[in-house]
From Swiss-Prot:
Record PANTHER family: POTASSIUM CHANNEL AKT1, POTASSIUM CHANNEL KAT2
Domain KHA per the UniProt entry, residue ranges: 530-601
Keywords carried by this UniProt record: Ion channel, Ion transport, Membrane, Potassium, Potassium channel, Potassium transport, Transmembrane, Transmembrane helix, Transport, Voltage-gated channel
Protein residues bound to a nucleoside 3',5'-cyclic phosphate: 356-475
Superkingdom assignment: Eukaryota
Intramembrane residue ranges: 228-247
Regions of this protein lying in the Cytoplasmic compartment: 1-42, 93-112, 166-179, 273-601
The protein, known as: Potassium channel KAT2
Known role: Probable inward-rectifying potassium channel. Assuming opened or closed conformations in response to the voltage difference across the membrane, the channel is activated by hyperpolarization.
Primary residence: membrane
Family note: Belongs to the potassium channel family. Plant (TC 1.A.1.4) subfamily.
Length: 601
């Protein structure tokens, strides 16, 4: 399990050929930015950054005379960031061009000096301590203004939120809200402190925004003064403006003008981001309601029957519920190899149970699985109509589907299909109108396979084609729901379409088996590999080569040499090579149409 600090970082892209668990080897004394100890150190610094962001404006406005406790805490925090500067000189960095970690000390130092080194040093110098060392103006405004450079550390928080927003383990909505709230609180805190600083530095305390409301405000408790400043800041930011606290002099007026101009941009930023988050959350629901309303109006305008309207609304509701799965969009965005692996993992166990594919090769199974698409259907949904043109084959994964046949104007339920059964295959393979209708009984998940895709796969795999056609023939012979005319027509169309027509009928199973065996033997003969053999002799410089011979490839190399000796009886054959003069020692590597060369040495 990864530690909590791991979510703050993005690991480097591994080079091609690297193993998933390959460790990163760096030079001695060089720190990896992805080391767990360094990540813990960075997480600790983030806590100190939050403290610095709050204390810097507060010290500038309210703490004219720093106590030794506050000064000690500030110096300790500065020392931690000074240590981080030293560590950065030994910290490897990720090259944005090669995406490799650079561990060359010279390059690390050069990069740091040319980037954030000067800013990090200026934000780490203990200016208050320097004032105390010089014994003059130790708590002067100049030193306190220089201490505001510590706000440069906020860039670490900005990088943190940028990483958190990309972390899929965290809720993006709440990360964005946290960021917006943090920006708002920091702006309110800084503006309140700055406005109090202006009033505190004004010569006439009575003519200040806080002095007009609270006479002798400097004698008040620190908490009262801070809350009053924050109250003014938040009412101005939200444009509430009760009027009880307002600018009394030109300095405060100028600051109020600048603050309100800043508020215009900040408010636009906050409202724009929040609106975007809210719209993203409600847009899907609004589109669903609009679709339901449009479908209802369509049904009412065209006076559709109630059951058709219910089917429309059920389909829309199911699509809305399953939209979050986004199966097709997710799979389409992946490479073909990953899609094939996912499809095999999800659908291959289901395909193996289908009677139509019993006995087919694993290669054919893979081809079928990768072309299937998963779909959801609501209850009482019509999947296939009777006598419609065959378009798709469906396999039931979950749910229930009933098979209906209309006889003499009356629709009857013939069978209820369960998980792992296929339907629509008779019309598709036999190229006839669908003999039955299929309706879902409850919410069902189906695998859909296009007609053209299925036929192409069957045609490309001759051995599997015979197995599939044989399985379908046996299924139809065992099924007594179809008439003899329908069965004979289906079998005839099936074999005519795939070029394997036989005269079997559903009424004579013995003749069908004998005919199928004869056809299988004939097909095997047609599928023998044909090769062209040549004679190549090295005994003479310019031999008269005999004509090449086209033969059927036998089952072994010994038989092949025997045939070649008969064809080239005047030569002594010693070796068999391919056109690239690579020796062949296995009959299985020879393909249909290859040119083989027998050598005489």
């Amino acid at each position: 399990m990864e530690t909590i600090s791991n979510i703050f970082h993005n690991d480097p892209l591994p080079p091609l050929g690297a193993r998933a668990n390959q460790s990163i080897k760096l030079r001695k004394f060089i720190i990896s930015p992805y080391d767990s100890r360094y990540r813990t150190w960075e997480t600790f610094l983030l806590v100190l950054v939050v403290y610095s962001a709050w204390i810097c404006p507060f010290e500038l406005a309210y703490l004219r005379n720093l106590s030794w406790k506050v000064s000690l805490v500030d110096n300790i925090i500065d020392s931690f960031f000074a240590i981080d500067i030293i560590l950065t000189f030994f910290l490897a960095y990720l090259d944005q061009k090669s995406y490799l970690l650079v561990d060359d000390p010279k390059r690390i130092v050069a990069r740091y000096f040319s980037s954030w080194f000067l800013f990090d040093v200026c934000s780490t110098i203990p200016y208050q301590l320097l004032g105390q060392i010089f014994k003059k103006h130790e708590n002067g405004l100049a030193y306190r203004l220089l201490s505001m450079l510590r706000l440069w550390r906020l860039r670490r928080l900005s990088e943190l939120f940028a990483r958190l927003e990309k972390d899929i383990r965290l809720n993006y909505y709440w990360i964005r809200c946290t960021k917006l709230i943090s920006v708002t609180l920091f702006a309110v805190h800084c503006s309140g402190c700055f406005n109090y600083l202006i009033a505190d530095r004004y010569p006439n305390p009575a003519r200040t925004w806080i002095g007009a409301a609270i006479p002798n405000y400097r004698s008040q408790n620190l908490w009262v003064r801070y809350v009053t400043a924050i109250y003014w800041s938040i009412t101005t930011l939200t444009t509430t403006g009760y009027g009880d606290l307002h600018a009394e002099n030109q300095r405060e007026m100028l600051f109020s003008i600048c603050y309100m101009l800043f508020n215009l941009g900040l408010t636009a930023y906050l409202i724009g981001n929040m609106t975007n988050l809210v719209v993203q959350g409600s847009c899907r629901t609004r589109n669903f309601r609009d679709t339901i309303h449009a479908a209802s109006q369509f049904a009412a305008r065209n006076q559709l029957p109630g059951h058709i309207k219910d089917e429309m609304l059920s389909h829309i509701c199911l699509r809305y519920k399953t939209e979050g799965l986004k199966q097709k969009e997710t799979l389409d965005s992946l490479p073909k190899g990953i899609r094939s692996s996912i499809a095999c993992n999800l659908f291959l166990p289901v395909i193996e149970k289908v009677y139509l594919f019993h006995g087919v090769s694993f290669t054919c199974m893979i081809q079928l699985v990768t072309e299937m698409e998963a779909e959801y259907y609501p209850p009482r949904e019509v999947v296939i109509l009777q006598n419609e043109a065959p378009r798709d084959v469906y396999i039931l994964v979950s749910g229930a589907v009933e098979e209906r046949v209309e006889i003499d104007g009356t629709e009857k339920v013939q069978e209820v299909l369960c998980n792992g059964e296929i339907f629509g295959e008779i019309g598709v393979i036999c190229s006839i109108p669908q003999p039955c209708a299929f309706h879902t009984i409850k919410v069902s998940q189906l695998l859909r396979l296009n007609t053209a895709v299925l036929k192409n796969i069957i045609k490309e795999n001759s051995d599997d084609r015979r197995v599939i056609l044989n399985n379908l023939s046996q299924k139809m012979n065992q099924d007594h729901r179809f008439s003899t005319e329908v069965m004979e027509k289906s079998l005839q169309m099936m074999h005519q379409h795939f070029g394997e027509y036989n005269r079997c009928s559903a009424l004579n199973q013995d003749n069908e088996k004998n005919e199928l065996k004869a056809n299988n033997g004939h097909s095997m003969a047609l599928e023998w590999k044909r090769v062209t053999i040549h004679m190549y002799s090295q005994r003479n410089k310019r031999p008269e080569a005999p004509l090449a011979k086209v033969i059927n490839l036998p089952g072994s190399l010994d038989k092949l040499f025997a045939i070649a000796c008969q064809k080239f009886n005047n030569y002594r054959l010693t070796k068999l090579v391919n056109p690239e003069f690579a020796e062949i020692d296995d009959i299985t590597v020879i393909r249909d149409g290859d040119h083989l060369f027998f050598m005489e040495i």
